Amino acid sequence: MMITGVKITLILMAATTVTSLCLGTVIAIMRISRIKTMRVIGTLYVEIFRNIPGLFWILFFYFVFPELLPSEWGYKLNHYEYYPIVAGIIGLTVDNASYVSDILRSGRLAIPHGQREAAISTGLGRVQQYLHVLLPQMFRATLPPLGTRMVHNFKNTSLCMAITTPELTWATQQIESLTFRGIEATMIATLFYIALAGVMISAIILLEKFLKIDSTSLSKAKA
């Protein structure tokens, strides 16, 4: 049961890392768009999702969202075996993406305006400017805070136990209920969390060294 919990935790972490980076990138670009409507939508997204606890969104997508759909669809979702995992991924994604967008937006604003002018002078379109010039620099400049954010996102996977997602914390609670050996189960789960977070931080630091980025900000990631 504990190993299964670790596997589900890793699935949640990997899925939400990818989806929140993608969604956060889109929101960040919207917030710095020259189109006012896009800026307003991006800003509203961040203000709404950043100021409401992540646990709320996990509960919302598990309990409320199926009720908002046509009855047949809602019924299928409620009886879908893996919906607790799916709802957890969606809830964590929309929450984490609001923070990721803020980080990436700061990275975009830190890029000298001449970089974009140079891209325009070479004939690159707006999409190509982002793909080939701006996005690589945005991610490189913001890797330390992004890494820290992803470690926090990993720890937030434990919130999914509230909707019976069989991740590590939920598995620990079940073991305690079945065996009454809560101390041992909790200690083992703690070691798993420390080990997994340590692997994440080490991988990020190695990537930063490869890219020659100052990684001092990651020293607080486990706090």
Where do the protein language model's features map onto the residues?
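Transmembrane alpha-helices and adjacent helix-loop boundaries
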Residues: 1-223
